[in-house]
A protein has these predicted regions:
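Conserved sequence/active-site signature of Rossmann-fold short-chain dehydrogenase/reductase
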Residues: 27, 77-79, 112
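NAD(P)-dependent short-chain dehydrogenase/reductase
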Residues: 60-104
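Active-site beta-alpha turn of Rossmann-fold NAD(P)-dependent dehydrogenases/reductases
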Residues: 20-23, 73-75, 131
Length: 189
C-alpha cells in the first residue's frame, strides 16, 4: 500500500482521480451494540483493526484538489458463493458456541458493486459505512431466519473470546442521505 500511495502522489496533478478504498466496519470493534456512525473513533486495540486504520489513513493522505478519496467500511459480505442465511440456518436445533449477543453488520455483494459505481459517478470524497439496514444480534438474526423457515431455534452457549469482534449497530444513514439506495436492504427475507 505504501508503494501505491507513493506512486499516486507522484502522478501528474492535472488529471482528476477518483479513489475508492474498501475497508471494514470491523474497525469499530466492540461498541457493546451502540449505534455507530462514521464519526466514531476507531478501535486500534486489535492488530487487524490497527492495520485497517493505518491503510485508511494512508489512502486519505492522497486526498487533494485533484484526488477524491472515498472509503467504504463494509459489513460482512453475503451473496453468490457466500450464503450467510443458509450458514445461519444450519445451526437450527443445534448448539452454537459463540456470543449471540454481538451485533454484526451485513452487505450484499450486489450493493458493494453498485456503491463503488455510485462513488465514481458522484465523485465521492468522504468515508461511508456500506452496510444494509439489518441491525440484529447474531442470535436474533438466526432466530428470525429459523422462524421464517419453520425450523427449531438454535441454542446459544456464550463463550468469552479474545477474537476480533464487531459489536455495533452500524448506521448507513450518511450514504443514504447522498442518494444511495440498497437493492438488498436486509439479509432477512
Amino acid at each position: 500500500l505504501k508503494l501505491l500511495t507513493d506512486a499516486l502522489q507522484k502522478r501528474p496533478r492535472e488529471t482528476p482521480l477518483q479513489l475508492v478504498h474498501l475497508s471494514s466496519c470491523g474497525v469499530y470493534g466492540n461498541r457493546h451494540g451502540a449505534l455507530t456512525d462514521e464519526s466514531v473513533r476507531l478501535d486500534s486495540l486489535h492488530p487487524v483493526n490497527e492495520v485497517l486504520a493505518m491503510a485508511e489513513d494512508m489512502i486519505q493522505s492522497l486526498r487533494s484538489e485533484s484526488v477524491n478519496v472515498c472509503i467504504f467500511r463494509l459489513g460482512g459480505i453475503y451473496g453468490p458463493g457466500r450464503d450467510i442465511p443458509a450458514m445461519l440456518l444450519s445451526a437450527a436445533g443445534g448448539v452454537v458456541q459463540r456470543n449471540g449477543q454481538n451485533v454484526p453488520c451485513w452487505i450484499h455483494l450486489e450493493d458493494v458493486v453498485r456503491a463503488v459505481s455510485f462513488a465514481f459517478e458522484h465523485n465521492l470524497n468522504d468515508t461511508y459505512n456500506l452496510v444494509n439496514d439489518t441491525q440484529f444480534t447474531g442470535q436474533e438474526l438466526t432466530d428470525r431466519l429459523c422462524e421464517q423457515a419453520g425450523l427449531p431455534l438454535a441454542k446459544w452457549f456464550t463463550i468469552d473470546t479474545t477474537d476480533r469482534v464487531l459489536n455495533a449497530r452500524v448506521s448507513n444513514e450518511k450514504l443514504k442521505q447522498i442518494g444511495f439506495t440498497f437493492t438488498r436492504p436486509s439479509i432477512v427475507g
